[in-house]
Amino acid sequence: LLWKGVVVLVAIFVIVTLLRVLYVSKNTPAQVAKIHATKLTMDDVMGVNLPSDPGAEADKTVAGIDANKNGIRDDVELAIFKEYPNSAKTRAVLLQYALALQMEMTLPILNRETATAVVEDNQSKALKCIWSISSRSDMDKFTAETDKNENFVKDRQINTEDRKKYMHNFYKYVGSYSVSDDWCDIDVSVLKN
């Protein structure tokens, strides 16, 4: 009787595993397409639909709160607007990086293909976007400015132990990739400040 119970449990485990593999293999291409299609908008940069402050709710889950559904965690979005109320260029590059990091934290399917797609298409592009608003005439100043901008977002986005653990696990899935040829989702040269 015990032997039959073990066989039934193993059979259930195998069936559940096969169903999961089928689900992931069927849905991964759609998820990768969604990753490639997700872009920052001018409305995001200009604060057209700013969310309210989520308060303590922001840190209760890895994903946090995105009430305005723009792909950027609300507390991070509000921090960027608070710090840079008069610089649309800086907001644009920081929001794009926040969007990329949030995509990493909210993937419904986490596997090598989706993790690599987010880093290759969105994170590498967002970092290049951050670099685009700093002059390279003084490389020490360039490095300091770009590090400051990158860390401003990263320190707010990856700000709990659960988020740090999640990101550590996320990067285990990233395969080799080439850096995106694209830069910013928004043409920052059209922004006055």
Label each residue range with its predicted role:
Residues 1-69, 75-193:
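Calcium-binding acidic motifs and repeat modules
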